[in-house]
């Protein structure tokens, strides 16, 4: 059929005009239309929050389909599995709509094929796609397609720690042992263990894995900074410029401060005060030195400049005016602290290079050995799979070309959160001019997952400067939020975000515009509010001990406003969402809301599972079974509700012997052989007797049964599962216990067997201060939502409270002894021995930790990256609100009133100030004070503690009890009648559509055969319950050596072998033997494969020879999906499967399938698989529109190989 052609720019302009002049209620914007129809070049869509990027993606894909591009010719990468599912649902809906309006049967048939193809199309996460590549082509790297993913961090840690320990031991005894010990001590200090060094190794390893080629990065970039920045001349020019800018800013801020009305310039006698003279001198020097830097100092004089500044400015950060502290000098102190010691640093920095080379060697060895261990386990992390996929595409031109020819377009959503591994994959899949990228750099908030917003930014600038490289389209209309939210968001980020902090200039092209007239309607009551708890705490932002969780008073402040909204404005609780930076330490909110009757649900994912009481009891039970000599665990078990020993009981047992382990004391008490057996009362003796018998039963049971069975035996023997079901929050407690059994079962499925190893894994989790996610249970519907800002991304809520805006940003990484840069490599704090610097050797050693220049540069880069991400995080949080936005924190109204009044730089807060501020609140107050003469569209309101009493806050009305006398409300009998009527109607529908209700949505060919066995009239689709054997050969096996072979394992191994054989015009026995070595199966299974039969197939049978002759037309392990109709209900379902192989010729297809079933008569298997082969043939007919299909079974389970042609 003939499809519509793609549109040129003139055609797109016509559509834009028509849309503008249409009477549609909601019109597409010109930019949306351009993004949907632009064709023939790379396209980058910069889509601001709420601008309809998903709508654009779906419409563009649909347009491609309507122009004849099959769905399997599109590569569509999404950020999450959930996003992929939602995209598929929207596509299905749009295709169904197009089917209804399709005018030709050909188009209907084509769209129906695309509808079926959605589920098997390449729409999903990059992780899922790279797994698909490795499954199919991993054999080129010697990787088995039957691998598993190491998703559990705890399992990864077990393997990693074992590899690390072995390698560490090798280096400690190797030829560079002395230097290696020095390297370890550089990071571990005087600690006796090497845990700190191990964490640094893991940090470098994890960072390298985010690059597209970890080994190459380690070899070429890792030492780059250390080898480059060795003297003053190597200091980057931008670092010098930045320092001079900080000096200018400090001078300007100090000058503004001295001009304030409250600043005391003169004494009572009219003479300048000492402070005023000192400050004027500082201003004069800073301006002079910054303006004449090259003349006075130059790069070689940076250390002298830093020392001169130190001698002029005060040692503290603050200047106090009228009782208010202004941290004028903080940023300048931060910048010069390392510079003034550069001469000494350069002197010792060279010593660290050899240690870094040793670290480089260690990490490379660790990476290789860790990978080999994972290969041995046939289990890999997602990053391994991604790197395998890249290696396959880079090293195999034919495979790469196959994908580049296959994809009409390579599309990616959330492009701003791509990392370099994902970017390399997209480059390899694209032909260079068919990429479609959608994202928003202002919403890049996944740097902790190694996402790099500069990937987006580089494309943005390149396409902006040179349109021939690609088309840049900016979507700035917002269809989510009211003007009150949009205006406050714009006013904040116009003055905050630029390329230095935020990574992009928030100019008019990025400002949010209301996309519909409805949003432009003004509602004064919905003006954005910054609610601050008025507190007299001094130096809130400078307190290192600041609590990161929200204070009870702040929680009360939020509760008060929510109750007001609910009562006065009839806002349902479910319309309100609280956003927090972290999912931990929010207990204060939960307790406060519970106190005032506000229903609250969290987004899940809290990491408190192992700390729940019922799980702790079970873990101590398992620890005791594993090792009864663990006194802490055993006493906890005895004290638990399972056995109910009280303190008096335990004391009587304990004094039976002073020195023994507690378990031995219990045994002494059991046998009445202790030193004070007279203290064991009959009642206590009965308890001990019961415990010992039960406990020994569990220990015996553990030797021969799975962890899963052991845990359930404990639950049932002591009724513990039922017991917790009677406690408060019973549903959650029972779910936790049930999950413990499932997690134990999952653990053993990974190949790690045994109670000891499971306990060791759990203890490692706790030792590393990690935990497992809580188990989700049913939650109330009409409740306030509490979630992290990260979790809220992509969502929208009517009322949003951003909590704890006074929380300090986490700067832990900046204080690390090791900081990594993607472009400059490693920078470290080097511990130098400066003993010989002293004139007299007063001490045996003088150790000084110094920040090397690469470390200082990386530190500044990391600080700016951290602040930029926090700024984008605030943008994401503010743009979630539809109607009204609240930001909640705490500050002192009297002491902080003028604290943030700054001098504007190019309509932005000064860079030096933005770098100094470490909370959302700092930014908001500084913008408000610095630009108070402008309309900023948000108010700052202080709330005192006196306004947060129970009387002022109020209470949510409790539900009223049922009143039987109120006839108007007592409609019970009517409800029952109506309910019975509804149930009868439902039952009638169930019977009418029983077949459709029971019909599964997706089935495999084998399942189709079984499911339709009673109703399908297909020859051979009956389930064979018995096989009549013509002869019986009864032999007694030797049970000492014989092992029953698993038919399924043998079948899987044979199929993998046939897939791995390198096909050519002449397959030899050596090729089959080589392929067999690559098969991932037990040795016994491999030995059971009769490769002589396979060799016979290729050498002697007509089909085998023909396959070799037509190898260029051969397809192996081909997945398919096909739409079928249930004959009884008329409902449609999808059949999916994998075809072993077929030859796709010009006018016919030769289909073949391997079978390892045992047989005597080949006709048995021919009849058995008639229906399955018919389904395969039908799928191929629909895919290629070829009628003639020859079907063959290759039977390997008989005495000799048989090739059977099907009817």
UniProtKB/Swiss-Prot annotation:
User: What are the UvrD-like helicase ATP-binding domain coordinates in residue numbering?
Assistant: 26-482
Q: Which InterPro entries match?
A: AddA, DNA_helicase_UvrD-like_C, DNA_helicase_UvrD/REP, P-loop_NTPase, PDDEXK-like_dom_sf, PDDEXK_AddAB-type, Restrct_endonuc-II-like, UvrD-like_ATP-bd
Cite the binding residues for ATP.
Answer: 47-54
CDD domains recorded for this chain?
DEXQc_UvrD (cd17932)
Top-level taxon of origin: Bacteria
Keywords noted in UniProt: ATP-binding, DNA damage, DNA repair, DNA-binding, Exonuclease, Helicase, Hydrolase, Isomerase, Nuclease, Nucleotide-binding
Question: Which biological process terms from the Gene Ontology are attached to this UniProt entry?
Answer: double-strand break repair via homologous recombination
- Which reactions does this protein catalyse? Couples ATP hydrolysis with the unwinding of duplex DNA by translocating in the 3'-5' direction; ATP + H2O = ADP + phosphate + H(+)
Q: Where is the UvrD-like helicase C-terminal domain?
A: 510-794
Q: Which residues form the signal peptide?
A: none
This entry's Enzyme Commission designation comes to 3.1.-.-, 5.6.2.4
User: GO molecular function, one example?
Assistant: double-stranded DNA binding
GO cellular component annotations, sorted alphabetically? cytosol; DNA helicase complex
The protein's required cofactor(s) are namely: Mg(2+)
Q: Which Pfam families match?
A: PDDEXK_1 (PF12705), UvrD-helicase (PF00580), UvrD_C (PF13361)
User: Which Gene3D superfamilies does the record match to this protein?
Assistant: 3.90.320.10, P-loop containing nucleotide triphosphate hydrolases, PCRA, domain 4
> What biological function has been recorded for the protein in this entry?
The heterodimer acts as both an ATP-dependent DNA helicase and an ATP-dependent, dual-direction single-stranded exonuclease. Recognizes the chi site generating a DNA molecule suitable for the initiation of homologous recombination. The AddA nuclease domain is required for chi fragment generation; this subunit has the helicase and 3' -> 5' nuclease activities.
Instruction: Return the HAMAP family for the record.
Output: AddA
- Give the family per the record: Belongs to the helicase family. AddA subfamily.
Q: Which NCBIfam families match?
A: addA_Gpos (TIGR02785)
What quaternary structure, including any partners, is listed in this protein's UniProt entry? Heterodimer of AddA and AddB/RexB.
Q: What is this protein called?
A: ATP-dependent helicase/nuclease subunit A
Species: Streptococcus agalactiae serotype III (strain NEM316)
